[in-house]
């Protein structure tokens, strides 16, 4: 069975595209952060997601590795979508969402990046009152998407996976969902 990583920066609509795509396809949708949290809670290391950041880096690496292994094991019986981030923007710079020790355990077959124009993402972010998102310029949004592309290609180089970009433009959700379905079938 396949392991497909789907990622997009906040406001790209990756979750919306994914939810609509999976209504018609037989994939198990797994959020990588949720699996990490489950493992850390089972081990008695944390009680909630916010406490994950406070764990020593080596413990976090062990949890990341265990989460990737757990997801790969699930793929023996199901096609898996891993909903995660290729890169995480931090005050210190961009952090890889899938370090090599995760990729070695996860063994993804494909990376799908959901993107939109910077203007569309900017507008979506400021109009979404349900989320507390950082305000970024159009150039910063473009840079984040470029970093995702670079990271996805680096990940693909390490794993032999392919990289597909699905555009999710305003008022064209059906088109993005159709393209995503054709990639996953």
Swiss-Prot record:
Q: Which InterPro entries match?
A: Adenylate_kinase_AdkA (IPR023477), P-loop_NTPase (IPR027417)
**Which Pfam families does this one have?**
AAA_17 (PF13207)
Q: Does the keyword Nucleotide-binding apply?
A: yes
Gene Ontology cellular-component terms listed: cytoplasm
Q: Where in the cell is it found?
A: Cytoplasm
Protein EC: 2.7.4.3
Where does this protein hold ATP?
8-16
Highest taxon, organism lineage:
Archaea
Q: List, in alphabetical order, the Gene Ontology terms for molecular function in this entry.
A: adenylate kinase activity; ATP binding
The portions of this protein that span the membrane are: none
- Please write the reaction equations for the catalytic activity of this protein: AMP + ATP = 2 ADP
Keywords, in A-Z order: ATP-binding, Cytoplasm, Kinase, Nucleotide-binding, Transferase
Record keywords: Transport included? no
Q: Which family does it belong to?
A: Belongs to the archaeal adenylate kinase family.
Stated name of the protein: Adenylate kinase
- In which organism is this protein found? Methanothermobacter thermautotrophicus (strain ATCC 29096 / DSM 1053 / JCM 10044 / NBRC 100330 / Delta H) (Methanobacterium thermoautotrophicum)
Q: State the organism's lineage.
A: Archaea, Methanobacteriati, Methanobacteriota, Methanomada group, Methanobacteria
């Amino acid at each position: 069975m396949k392991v497909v990583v789907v990622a997009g920066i906040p406001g790209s609509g990756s979750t919306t595209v994914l939810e609509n795509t999976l209504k018609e396809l037989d994939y198990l949708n797994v959020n990588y952060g949720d699996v990490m949290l489950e493992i850390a809670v089972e081990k008695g290391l944390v009680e909630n997601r916010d406490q994950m950041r406070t764990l020593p880096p080596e413990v976090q690496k062990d949890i990341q590795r265990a989460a990737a292994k757990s997801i790969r094991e699930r793929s023996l019986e199901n096609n898996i979508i891993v909903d995660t981030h290729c890169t995480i923007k931090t005050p210190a710079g961009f952090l890889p969402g899938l370090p090599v020790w995760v990729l070695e355990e996860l063994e993804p077959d494909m990376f799908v990046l959901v993107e939109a124009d910077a203007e569309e993402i900017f507008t979506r972010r400021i109009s979404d009152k349900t989320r507390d998102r950082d305000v970024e310029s159009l150039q910063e949004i473009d840079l984040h998407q470029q970093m995702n592309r670079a990271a996805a290609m680096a990940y693909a180089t390490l794993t032999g996976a392919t990289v597909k970009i699905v555009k999710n433009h305003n008022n064209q959700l059906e088109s993005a969902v159709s393209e995503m379905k054709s990639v996953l079938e």
